[in-house]
Amino acid sequence: AKINSGGESSGAVHFMELFDRVAAVVSQGNVRRGSFAAYLPIEHPDVKEFLRIRSEGNAIQEMSFAVTVTDSWMRGMIDGDQDKKDLWASVIKKRYETGYPYIFFQDNANNQAPDCYKDQGMKIYASNLCNEISLPSKEDESFVCCLSSLNLIQWDEIVKTDAIETLTMFLDAVMEEYIQKTEHIPFMEASHNFAKRHRAIGMGVLGWHSYLQSNMISFESMEAKLLNSSIFKKIRKSSDKATEELANLLGEPLYCQGYGRRNTTTLAIAPTTSSSFILGQASPSIEPLNGNYFTKDLAKGKFSYRNPYLKSLLEEKGKDTDDVWLSILNSGGSVQRLPFL
């Protein structure tokens, strides 16, 4: 694209190579590499080049990426705009082949944003590395969010306690520590500003599928749907109660003033790939397990996984043998071919 002052820009994707390289040389304790996600509007002139990221021979091989899609663009595609249909097909094909790009429906995020954002005209343009938070950003604010997850394997005990309220308060305390520690660090001004003015936190869950299996409830059953609704209503109600109590005790940040809240957001469903495995080999987040016997490749090593609830069932039927587990492994973790189930 041409530059007003003269010359020509190499385009958005060219500059993404810089972020990809920077992330590649950053590590957490020499174990986990840095990560970065780029979001680009689907109507951007460089989107076709963008969709070639991670392809064989492409300069960018590690970076996560996403397209942002508006309602008006989708309506045009559905109404038959051939260029939009062809581009959408390319997005879906790429996603089928690689898992990328994420698809972020921008208008959905803004329509469902907290009142404190909508009332103040604050716009959400993109999400984060794992697409679990929807927060606004602007020149002097770069969004940050403190995350944690409830282990639903323990839900029957959690619901009898104040664990949800306690976790909400804990996350707010973590945010306060971040605000204090980043106050005078160079180049952290934008994230510090966001943390101080929003105090956004995100409580999620892990072990949803494990909880269902422990109670012999089918993942797609009506019972599971009703249970899902009940659990998240409880989490929402309790987290709202906690942030309101915090506002009364400690005050409201800039963008919550007049709303009776300490935090602009309280919930977020993160993927929890590693943490769920550490916490009792629970299923990740709200997702189903992709098999009953497989090798888990995590930051700190490779670990074999045998579904503990299936193991208990096999023990009941006298079928918990190496031969049975080998047949499950050879079937990609599936038990559909086992005649006794």
Predicted stretch roles:
Residues 1-341:
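Long, C-terminal-biased catalytic regions of enzyme "large/alpha" subunits
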